[in-house]
């Protein structure tokens, strides 16, 4: 077994304004709240916010880096709920909990069900997540 029920893993991340803008451009997200500090200052958010594609990538990336250190890993499905913005220059905690591990003979590994979130500097959940990955010896 390469994953364990109740296993937790996390990391802290701070996205700079230039990282927020570059990721949004690369993802094809033209919303100026991710690119233009002057525009963002006039919104309800008052500053640059990371795109949903960027925050979801942080969550998916953490599963990949965590489980790939133990063997082969493939993402099967992910679900996200965006509750509040993640701001540029805000240090956030990206967290996952292994909820269930199911051996899957046909796929040749364990199907791992996860529950995750990104917590803002205030401790509140900014993004909620669920995921399912395959962890195996080989692909």
Q: Which residue stretches match the model-derived regions?
A:
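Catalytic strand-loop segment that frames the active site of acyl-thioester-processing enzymes
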Residues: 1-50, 137
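HotDog/MaoC-like acyl-thioester-processing domains
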Residues: 1-8, 85-139
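Short, intrinsically disordered/low-complexity patches at protein termini
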Residues: 33-34, 73-74, 79-81, 111-112, ...
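Sparse recognition of residues in long alpha-helices and their boundaries
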Residues: 39, 75, 105-106
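Hydrophobic beta-strand-centered segment that forms part of the acyl-chain substrate-binding groove
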Residues: 43-50, 56-99
